[in-house]
Amino acid sequence: GYKKEYLVKTGLCYETDDHRLRDRFWGRVIFPVHTLSGKVVAFGGRVLASATKGVKVKYVNSPESEIYHKSNELYGIYFAKQAIVKQDRCFLVEGYTDVISMHQSGIENVVASYDSPVHQQYDCALRW
């Protein structure tokens, strides 16, 4: 398996006060976060109501790291980039499931931000 330090550093797990390792995304659907080039740099997780009754936090994201800064990433950009270039426009939606729903409906030039408000660097990223 992987070393404890690696699992904590990557954000897949966290350490409790009593030094136990816990899965950050337990009971959640996991969404990989890709860079523009397709590299997976983080994960997001949405709670499954049936698996985690009483959980108050609907979404959990990987913590920022050496390779992941949420203000620099757009969810779905890797899969949307060709459609954005082809159609010369991009829809910015709220979250992971919105991007997936639109892709399933045939609208591929769509991304979601990780920050509110939307940062200026997103505008630059969408103009590449």
Segments from the language model and where they lie:
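Phosphate-handling DNA/RNA-contact segment within nucleic-acid enzymes
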Residues: 1-128
